[in-house]
Regions:
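Acidic, low-complexity terminal tails and accessory targeting/binding regions
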Residues: 1-3, 69-81, 139-179
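Loop-to-helix element that buttresses phosphate recognition and phosphoryl-transfer chemistry
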Residues: 1-51, 99-111
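Generic beta-sheet signal
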Residues: 3, 121-132
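Phosphate-coordination/substrate-recognition cap region in phosphate-metabolizing enzymes
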Residues: 11-13, 28-87
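Glycine-rich phosphate-binding loop signature in dinucleotide/nucleotide-binding domains
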Residues: 36, 118-123
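Active-site catalytic microenvironments for nucleophilic, acid-base chemistry
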Residues: 55, 117, 140-144
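Short glycine/proline- and acidic residue-enriched helix-loop micro-motifs
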Residues: 86-106
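GST superfamily/GST-like fold recognition
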Residues: 131-135, 164
Length: 179
């Protein structure tokens, strides 16, 4: 089985160091993605199912486990407006969660759980998700966790390929794609 993971473009607000709101969906490139999506089943976060469906030309399978990180009360706030010690912990401590939000470790656990339950009977499948979720899937494939998160650089608008033959393997990570 081949699991092709496409990382979504970054929301525009990130360029201004503002944490996206829950409704801040990344701008998907114009036009259809037929050449990328082919006929493989598409999975995505339940937070992006509608725009992904419009972009891909068909309805994806929405999974809560593939949604972007929940930043709780920090959604829509500029980093410079948040308490500096909390921002430092948010960056350095995988167990830190913003108020009413989710820790990095929680994202890693839910992505790893999804991967462990991913049906491997398909010849191909596609995941379209936030870069953090794609990184979490790669870490789960490698059998590592939060300690390796900062060492893995997978940017927006990239392709990552993992395969399954008795176990998950990373074939390609963070390759640039053209829409």
């Amino acid at each position: 089985m081949h699991l092709t993971c496409l990382s979504l473009p970054a929301p525009d607000c990130l360029r201004r160091a503002i944490i996206p709101t829950r409704d801040d969906l990344p701008p998907l490139p114009p036009g259809q993605a037929a050449h990328l999506c082919a006929t493989a089943p598409i999975a995505c976060g339940d937070d992006t199912a509608i725009p992904v469906a419009q972009w891909a030309g068909r309805m994806p399978i929405a999974h809560a486990a593939l949604r972007a990180r929940d930043h709780g009360a920090w959604h829509g706030r500029a980093l410079h407006d948040l308490p500096a010690p909390d921002v430092a912990r948010w960056i350095a401590d995988p167990d830190f969660a913003p108020p009413d939000g989710e820790s990095l470790r929680a994202v890693l656990v839910r992505a790893a759980d999804w991967l462990s339950r991913c049906p491997t009977g398909h010849a191909n499948m596609m995941v379209i998700a936030d870069t953090m979720v794609i990184r979490a899937l790669v870490l789960a494939t490698l059998g590592t966790g939060a300690e390796a998160f900062a060492a893995l650089d997978i940017g927006p608008c990239t392709r990552t390929l993992v395969t399954f033959h008795n176990r998950w393997r990373v074939r390609e990570a963070g390759a640039a794609i053209t829409f």
